[in-house]
Each structure stands twice: as C-alpha cells, then as structure tokens.
Amino acid sequence: MTSASPSPLRAANAASSAPVPPPAMKPSAPPVNILPTQLARTYSFVHPAALLAILATRFQALVADPVAEMLNTLPFLALLQVTYVMVCLPPAGSVLPSPPASPVSDGDEKEKEKEKEKEKEKEKRKLPLRAGKLPRKKNQTHAAGLSAKLTPALLSLILTFLLATPVLSLLLVLFGAPLTTHNAETVLCAAHMALLASTALIYVHGVDGAVWREVWAFARPADAVWGGALGTALGAWFGAVPIPLDWDRPWQAFPITILTGAYFGFAVGSVVCRSSWLFGKWLEFTPEQDDRDKKTE
C-alpha cells in the first residue's frame, strides 16, 4: 500500500500559515552624529553642563518670581541653543544616506589613482602666498559655511516659537496646567521646553514629515538630538510629580519643578543617548514574537 504524496496546495497553505518575522525597522533618516571636530565634541558636553549651571544659579530667583525669571532667561537660552546647533550639529539636508556600494573594476581604480596623482601635482605647482595676504576663496568658503549654518539655525528658532511653543502650551494644559489662571507661566514654560526639545530637531531634520511622524510616535533612533527632546519631555513629566504633594514648599509652585525637570532631562538625554550602548537604537512597543506564536498555536 503506497502513501499518497502531499498535494502542492497543502504545502503552499502550510507555508503561508507559518509565522513571518516582522520586518526590521528602518528610520526615514539616520541617527545624527555630533560633528567630528574637537570644538563640537567638547562643546556638546559643555552645553548641557552650562544649562544646569545657569539653572542652579538662578533657581532662587525662579522660585521668587517665575514669570520674570523665565522671561529674562529666555533670550539667553535661545542664544545658547542656536550656538549649540551651529557648533555641534549638521544642518538639514547636509547628511544624506550613503548610496549602496557598486562594484568597481580595475580600470576605474586606475583612473581614480591617476586623478589623485594629477591633483597632487597641481597642488605642488601652486606658488606660496605672500605673508599678510589671505586667500579670497578661503574667506568666501568660510562665509558660505557660516551662512549655511546660521540661516537654518534662525529658521529653526522662528519655527520653535511659532509652532512648538503653542503646541507644548496646549499639551501642558491637557496634562493638568491651569486653563484660566497662570497663563503666562504656562506659555513661558512651554517656550523654554520648546527651545530645549525642538530647536535641534528642526535644525537637523527640517520639516520632513516622515521624521516628525517618527518623533510623535517615539520611533526615532537614539542620538543626541532625539535624546535631548525625549529627555525634556520625560523630565517635565516627572517634574510634575511634586506639585500636588502637601509639603508646602515654595518651589512646588507651578511650573518650577516642571521646568527644572525639563532642563535635567535635556542634559541627561542629550549625553546618554549618544553613548555607544544606546546610539542608533529605538523604543519598541510591539509584542514579542514568542507571545504571538503562543497565541496562534
């Protein structure tokens, strides 16, 4: 008695019912590195430390008069954030994903070597410049590089005040800030949080809709920019915890602890998320594959 061979239809159904692993997550834009200069690397650590130092020195004034203190320190925070993005981060459009490597033939390699040799010979033939004279091309290149950074920095600052501040003000109200009172405190706190969280995001990613969908979905890979924004939000969230407690301390008034938490969150997030054990990773909210397999069995 011969056994019947399995039909190809059954084999196809069995193959289609097998669990398929989820596709690997790919961000629309790669994680952002700090610029590879000694100044950028040094200032990327000095900047969060300077923000915390300013907060510590002005904390008593913040407790005494939150509105006046937040209003007075807002221009300095804007200047520090613009300096930070210009010194440490690449502007939007300057970092592009690397194209796939194409096979290079021996002839192409020889041509490239010849071109490099020709360039070296041209550099050797150049006459030395006279002392006291600067090359015009170098000055023009420096001015163009400064303009390429200053323009997106100012645009990011404008968009931060026009768009991010109203959105964060609304979110503060939705999460419990007073609606009919303390309006100045709410708007100024939102402005400080917007400068901390949004300035670098807008400077680096511009108005790319795919990137901003990932930002609102908490699906960005970890880097200094995303870490600073996420740290600002989490710090403000945890900073609101002491407000309803009955400790009767003057620093518990709204929005002192929220603003303090936002500053600490930005400093910690921007430093920690650029470390080697977190850089490039992202939060995953999907269930584990093993749990899905158990439910289907």
From Swiss-Prot:
Pathway annotation: Glycolipid biosynthesis; glycosylphosphatidylinositol-anchor biosynthesis
- For this entry, the protein name equals Glycosylphosphatidylinositol anchor biosynthesis protein 11
The GO terms this record gives for MF are: mannose-ethanolamine phosphotransferase activity
Q: Which organism is it from?
A: Aspergillus fumigatus (strain ATCC MYA-4609 / CBS 101355 / FGSC A1100 / Af293)
Give the Basic and acidic residues compositional bias ranges: 107-126
What is the recorded membrane topology of this protein?
A: Multi-pass membrane protein
Q: Which family does it belong to?
A: Belongs to the PIGF family.
In UniProt terms, what function does this protein have? Acts in the GPI biosynthetic pathway between GlcNAc-PI synthesis and GPI transfer to protein.
Region: Disordered; residue ranges are 1-26, 97-140
Q: Where is the composition biased (Low complexity)?
A: 1-18
Membrane-crossing ranges are: 44-64, 76-96, 157-177, 187-207, 225-245, 253-273
Composition-biased stretches, type Basic residues, lie in: 127-140
- Domain of life (superkingdom): Eukaryota
One of the protein's GO biological processes: GPI anchor biosynthetic process
Q: Which InterPro entries match?
A: GPI_biosynthesis_protein_Pig-F
What keywords appear on the UniProt entry?
A: Endoplasmic reticulum, Glycoprotein, GPI-anchor biosynthesis, Membrane, Transmembrane, Transmembrane helix
Where found, per UniProt?
A: Endoplasmic reticulum membrane
Task: Please state the protein's primary subcellular location.
Answer: endoplasmic reticulum
Q: Does the keyword Nucleus apply?
A: no
Q: Which residues are glycosylated?
A: N139
An example of a Gene Ontology cellular component annotation for this protein is: endoplasmic reticulum membrane
